[in-house]
Amino acid sequence: MKDMRICFIGDSFVNGTGDEKMLGWAGRLCAEARQHGHDTTYYNLGIRRNTSTDILQRWSEVSLRQQPDCDNRIVLSCGVNDTTMENGAMRVDFETSLQNMRDLFARMQSSPGLVVGPPPVDDELQNQRIQTLSNAMQSEAKKAGLPFISLFDHLIQDSNYLAEIAQNDGAHPRSTGYDKIARLISDSGKWWF
């Protein structure tokens, strides 16, 4: 069996910001895979405040970690920062964000990939923008033949998750929230293990 190398690229939610265990959902998923005997190496390429534009510009970070003799995988998750308002406008307008997603999805075709949609935050208006973007991402991922997991649809209905982010910084969960995200991904039937 080849060594599996998984690049998780995205924003602060990929990074695990707010998690007291410093694992985030990516670390939890790979720790569980390792416990079940899967030889995995994971690279957390999550950066706080990164938008889809930022991620597209640094895509070479993924390529640097992929090796021809390995089973290379890619997990992309972003979107919340695109929908954040700054100076009266979204950080990345909707059409640019969608085009960035198409470009990112095209780059993911080199390896088995998975797209994890953005989670809700403690801001009703931003959640409307996140939901719109998440739905569009799901549609584009389907066109690209990539599995998509909607965190928003599940977590917006979870009062405990929403309370946790409200008590933290209004966006990021703590360990319990990252446990939930990891479980949603693991139980989706789209995660590889």
Predicted segments with their positions:
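Serine-esterase "nucleophile elbow" of acetyl-processing enzymes
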Residues: 1-48, 53, 60-70
